[in-house]
Amino acid sequence: MLCVPVFIILFIIIPFAPTSESQPKTKEEVAKASVHDNAERTLQRLWNQSHCCPIDLQCCPPG
């Protein structure tokens, strides 16, 4: 009787297993990921620059 909750949890978790992540990506998927990473990096840099200290410029990241 104690095994029933374990089996229920396993049946819930199994469909979310990362099987698609283990497959190799196509060139198109890699290009999309690269563009997304570049955009994310640019947004992060702009966010960091917009929150600089106006008085003490040493707290601002270079670039």
UniProtKB/Swiss-Prot annotation:
The modification Proline amide is found at P62. One of its GO terms (cellular component) is extracellular region. Expressed by the venom duct. Residues 23-50 form a propeptide. Keywords: Amidation, Disulfide bond, Secreted, Signal, Toxin. GO terms for molecular function: toxin activity. Contains 2 disulfide bonds that can be either 'C1-C3, C2-C4' or 'C1-C4, C2-C3', since these disulfide connectivities have been observed for conotoxins with cysteine framework V (for examples, see AC P0DQQ7 and AC P81755). Residues 1-22 form the signal peptide. It is found in: Secreted. Belongs to the conotoxin T superfamily. The cysteine framework is V (CC-CC). This is Conotoxin Vi5.1b.
